Design a protein with these regions (language model features):
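Bacterial N-terminal signal peptides that target proteins for export
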Residues: 1-7
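Terminal, regulation- and interaction-focused segments at domain boundaries
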Residues: 21-62, 157
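Compact, glycine-rich, soluble single-domain proteins
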Residues: 46-47, 55, 59-116, 130
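Beta-strand/loop substructures that line and gate deep hydrophobic ligand-binding cavities in soluble
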Residues: 113-141
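C-terminal partner/receptor-binding element of secreted or periplasmic proteins
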Residues: 130-161
Length: 161
């Protein structure tokens, strides 16, 4: 009789300790915005202008815009609502091809992408950190610091200046 009571007490203490140490639930969207692997930069421009400015700047730097994915429009076409959200897929074979030759699996990280979204806080440009892109690959930062890393600088400059 004492043994079952002790077991129940131990279980209750364990559950109580777990409940006290539990952190508040974080949604995937919140997790992405605070991740050091993802950068979120406030744009000083309206949503549509931010998308256009990024596309123009990417092309002006000799890169190709491979696709523009309008998630908001796709949602509406399916009877759903969401905030404005557009992903620009871009890059240049001159920069990406040597990296994919060195590490074929790196093709999963390319082309680069930037999300432009409208939040209650304003328009934001969201993109993956260059070091996070190469993490786990055979690519060294020195191989991308003058190519892929420049895309981060370009995005920041376009939306903040």
């Amino acid at each position: 009789m004492i043994k079952p009571a002790l077991s129940a007490l131990a279980a209750a203490a364990t559950l109580s300790a777990c409940a006290q140490n539990a952190s508040p639930e974080t949604s995937p969207a919140q997790a992405a915005t605070v991740s050091p692997r993802i950068h979120t930069v406030a744009s000083k421009y309206p949503f549509a202008e931010t998308v256009t400015r990024l596309q123009n700047a990417i092309q002006a730097k000799g890169m190709t815009v491979f696709a523009v994915i309008d998630h908001h429009a796709a949602a509406r076409q399916n009877g759903l609502e969401m905030q404005p959200a557009t992903v620009i897929v871009f890059g240049t074979p001159k920069a990406g091809t040597p990296l994919m030759v060195k590490d074929p699996a790196f093709a999963l990280q390319l082309p680069l992408r930037v999300l432009v979204t409208q939040t209650p806080e304003g328009v934001q440009a969201v993109f993956t950190d260059t070091r996070a892109l190469i993490d786990g690959s055979r690519i060294e930062y020195s191989e991308v610091e003058n190519t892929l890393a420049n895309a981060e600088k370009l995005i920041r400059a376009v939306v903040t200046q």
